[in-house]
């Protein structure tokens, strides 16, 4: 597998700043945890899992200091992808056992950071192929499962799908949701979601870039066209030209013109 000779050196004539950086690096290393024999960087601050929302990105950033640990923050999600293509929204260690959790998506800051590791790790072709396989399978899963009403727009089914903990716009939607069909009898969900559409777009855009790297012009054009199809649907279905913004649509296809208290204030 990939190996990289990475490291970071910080120099300053300011002794206070030098000590501050040293202590910050020491604190960060406390967030390196053992997941079944593999070191990973957890979020910290009491968050002891790795979430798809943040930690592939966090790992890619940390890889310049510790490549093996940073790489594992992406590899763990790739290794624990289900046979149907779904990627766990989080991975935990429970009673000493690594447990992938499929009860939410929890964002999708994964494709681009994972591709960054390809370059940082010396352009390993096997890793690139594994990443492509992961993204293609997840994109296929999304379109097979998350367009329950067939309107061509992918859906969020619970608050944790988009990382919007306690979001009022979700109304009575569940926090996590483990089933492969949408919850029934809820006020808003399934919601046609710009977030979940962006998950597909990110997969397809990155797959086009992987095809370019691999010298496959035909596949590059195909994935680029598929990415544009997602983008076009988002614009045609979710964009509000008068307001200059996108808005999700609820289960009845009504535009969700939700604003937070902060957005209504004069701040």
State the predicted function of each range.
Residues 3-121, 125-128, 136, 247-267:
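Substrate-binding groove/exosite segments of carbohydrate-active enzymes
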Residues 89-109, 140-225, 249-262:
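The feature captures the catalytic groove of carbohydrate-active enzymes
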Residues 16-24, 66-79, 124-143, 199, ...:
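Extended, well-ordered alpha-helical scaffold segments
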Residues 32, 42-45, 86, 92-95, ...:
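Non-catalytic carbohydrate-binding regions of carbohydrate-active enzymes
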Residues 8, 15, 49, 85, ...:
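Flexible, active-site-adjacent loop/turn segments at secondary-structure boundaries
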Residues 26-28, 168-170, 178-179, 227-237:
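A generic short-segment signal for beta-strand/edge and adjacent turn/coil regions
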Residues 15, 52, 132, 162-165, ...:
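Short linear sequence elements within intrinsically disordered, low-complexity coil regions
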Residues 81-82, 146, 238:
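A generic alpha-to-beta junction signature in SAM-dependent methyltransferases
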């Amino acid at each position: 597998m990939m190996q990289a000779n990475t490291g970071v050196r910080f120099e300053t004539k300011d002794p206070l700043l030098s000590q501050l950086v040293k202590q910050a690096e020491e604190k960060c290393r406390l967030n390196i945890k053992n997941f079944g024999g593999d070191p990973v960087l957890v979020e910290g601050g009491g968050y002891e899992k790795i979430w798809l929302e943040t930690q592939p990105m966090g790992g890619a950033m940390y890889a310049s200091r510790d490549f093996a640990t940073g790489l594992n923050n992406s590899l763990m999600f790739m290794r624990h992808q289900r046979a149907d293509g779904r990627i766990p929204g989080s991975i935990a260690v429970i009673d000493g056992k690594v447990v992938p959790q499929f009860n939410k998506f929890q964002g999708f800051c994964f494709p681009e950071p994972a591709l960054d590791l390809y370059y940082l790790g010396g352009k390993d072709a096997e890793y690139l192929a594994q990443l492509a396989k992961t993204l293609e399978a997840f994109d296929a899963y999304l379109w097979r499962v998350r367009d329950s009403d067939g309107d061509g727009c992918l859906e969020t089914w619970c608050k944790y799908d988009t990382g919007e903990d306690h979001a009022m716009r979700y109304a009575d939607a569940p926090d996590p949701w483990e089933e492969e069909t949408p919850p029934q009898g809820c006020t808003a969900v399934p919601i046609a979601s710009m977030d979940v559409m962006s998950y597909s777009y990110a997969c397809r855009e990155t797959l086009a870039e992987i095809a370019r790297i691999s010298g496959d012009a035909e596949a590059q054009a195909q994935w680029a066209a598929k990415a544009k199809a997602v983008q076009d649907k988002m614009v045609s279905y979710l964009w509000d030209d008068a307001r200059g913004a996108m808005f999700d649509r609820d289960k009845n296809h009504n535009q969700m013109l939700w604003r937070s208290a902060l957005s209504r204030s004069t701040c």
